[in-house]
Amino acid sequence: MLTELVRSKLNVDRLLLRQQQGFRCVSPSGHNAFGTQFARVLPASSVANLYPFNYSGKLDGKGFYIGKDKYGSNILVDFDQRDEDKTSANILILGNSGQGKSYLMKLLILNLLESGKSVITLDAEHEQQEMCEAVGGCFADLMAGQYMINVLEPKCWDDCGDPNATDAPEAFRKSTLLAQHISFLKDFFRAYKDFSDAHIDTIEIMLSKLYQKFGITERTNFSRMRPTDYPILSDLYDLIEEEYKTYDTSRHQLYTEKLLQEVLLGLHSMCKGADAQFFNGHTNITSSRFLVFGVKGMLSAAKNVRNAMLFNVLSFMSDKLLTVGNTVAALDELYIWLSNPTAIEYIRNCLKRVRKKESAMLLASQNLEDFDQEGIREMTKPLFSIPPHQFLFNAGSIDKRSYMEMLQLEESEYKLIKFPQRGACLYKCGNERYLLEVHAPAYKEKLFGTAGGR
């Protein structure tokens, strides 16, 4: 009963040891014994909630069907609809394995495509491959070596840059596209190898020389350039190698010969060696409104390769979100990013900026305890507080107090998902709350394929 009152925005004052006064209040011959203490003006919305059969679910004007609530009313959601309590279209999906997260995610992706948005997803289990092919999308298995994202092709991290955003990575504070990308590359190379500051500064100097060699400056019109117009990692390696072979101590360079040698040794595998098949090449991903990056094989790769590849994919997503716009980036199994705290910072700052271009991010994960650890707890909290649209399934065996604190749940809200209910979740939409039973129309279910989430 208390849960229903809370959902109807009716606050409850518990009258302990006041039965006699309560009886007088409701008795035909009694009087209002609590009037002076508890009487207040009742809002019209609360009065309306007292009427029977007043509930109509959620019916956004341009919304798409995602299921029914516990009363049987339809839930139609338009994620782009802004309100005082919904300032972006970012989405969060959390829950234990087997509760229906993948099913909901596939339904939301199809709805977003139907609404006219482009979608880029990171598929950790290759669950979306059949659906991608069914709707004419592009499935790119990054470990197969067929598709490539050129690391040295400048990507946008912020359309204007805010030098005062001291809590953001350096790439978000630069004002020009080339400066943003060089700042990103410094973090990228750190993710690949444990380079010192001196190594990174040397690489930065070499990058500046490389872009000048290819005629790329701050004033370059990048919209007119083709993927093949940009340098690739082997070009960077050749430039550094030339600097090393022709090093002249009498010129008093900012970097030493030994530094160049160590940088060459650290970058050899990525530029010329075994890892070059994943990084060294021009971007050749087909233009598609639905692009799925298959990263299943990446999860078993070496940690440095995995971190660098995830960083590279994140840069591609950010560029589409902030330059093309009207795009949704979906990151499934968010926990795989936790091995790289810098990547978490980039995701957090993307969440804050994508709304400017009518874009959004969809984050999904299961083991919430992975995010509640020393060293990453403060970085991951915004990932759960920024999205105004949250779909919370049963979390399994987890500490109740920390779960409620991290997701800012009330006791009554937690009780709704305390026990496993396959396909049922708590849908938090700004200040609105719905106990949602996820249902997809039959014609959309046929597109889901035979993998997870069917």
What are these regions (language model features)?
Residues 10-11, 22-75, 81, 124-138, ...:
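P-loop NTPase motor domains
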Residues 141-144, 389-398:
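Conserved AAA+ ATPase "SRH/arginine-finger" region at the nucleotide-binding site
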Residues 99-151:
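Walker A/P-loop NTP-binding active-site region of P-loop NTPases
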Residues 148-153, 398-405:
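Conserved AAA+ ATPase core "coupling" helix
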Residues 125, 364-368, 395-397:
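A short beta-strand-to-loop transition that corresponds to the Sensor-1 phosphate-sensing loop
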Residues 19, 126, 146, 368-369:
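Conserved beta-strand edge residues that scaffold enzyme active sites
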Residues 1-37, 75-81, 85-105, 109-110, ...:
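Accessory regions of macromolecular translocation/handling assemblies
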Residues 130-135, 371-385:
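Short regulatory helix/loop adjacent to the ATP-binding pocket of P-loop NTPases
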